[in-house]
């Protein structure tokens, strides 16, 4: 129930029956106890090589403000976990590069590898070594296991050990699955 720019929320505008208002209040109270609320929505099948787990992760990552691609999101999550995300991003941008463009070229980005080397010299002897480490540590995968998917969702959404009450809305599921029993 995020407020609009004028401070009014959707719940304040809508004329809702008392029972519905009570349910929303209960939801808000539960959210306060469990790390907040989070919603993710998107269309299955867009950019995940016909892999339902990666398609779901793309949607969740995007909703959390992360890159949609698994390897890039895991890299950003690792930087955030180590507390060096802002430092690395600043170093990339100070070098005159766009963070998003460099992240897209993660394996060949001189500014990302150089920034990592400046922040943690134990990652490699030179930029070339750090690039190789990035390729090995964050490979571009074609699939993930169920456990890797669950772990990635938890890492993307949990904050301070709490997982928010989460709603995931998937559009075009029937079209995505079609008659493919592997997807079903």
Predicted regions mapped to residue ranges:
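Conserved P-loop NTPase "ATPase switch" module shared by AAA+ and STAND
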Residues: 161-181
């Amino acid at each position: 129930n995020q407020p609009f720019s004028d401070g009014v929320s959707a719940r304040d505008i809508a004329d809702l029956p008392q029972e519905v208002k009570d349910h929303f209040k209960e939801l808000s109270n539960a959210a306060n106890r469990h790390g907040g609320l989070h919603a993710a929505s998107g269309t299955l099948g867009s950019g995940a090589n016909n892999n339902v787990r990666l398609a779901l992760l793309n949607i969740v990552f995007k909703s959390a403000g992360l890159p949609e691609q698994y390897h890039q999101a895991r890299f950003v999550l690792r930087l955030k976990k180590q507390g060096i995300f802002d430092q690395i991003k600043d170093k990339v941008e100070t070098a005159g590069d766009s963070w998003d463009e460099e992240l897209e070229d993660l394996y060949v980005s001189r500014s990302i590898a150089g920034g990592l080397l400046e922040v943690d010299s134990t990652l490699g002897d030179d930029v070339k070594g750090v690039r190789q480490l990035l390729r090995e540590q964050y490979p571009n995968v074609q699939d993930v296991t169920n456990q890797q998917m669950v772990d990635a969702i938890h890492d993307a959404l949990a904050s301070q050990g709490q997982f928010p009450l989460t709603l995931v809305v998937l559009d075009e599921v029937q079209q995505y699955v079609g008659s493919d029993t592997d997807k079903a």
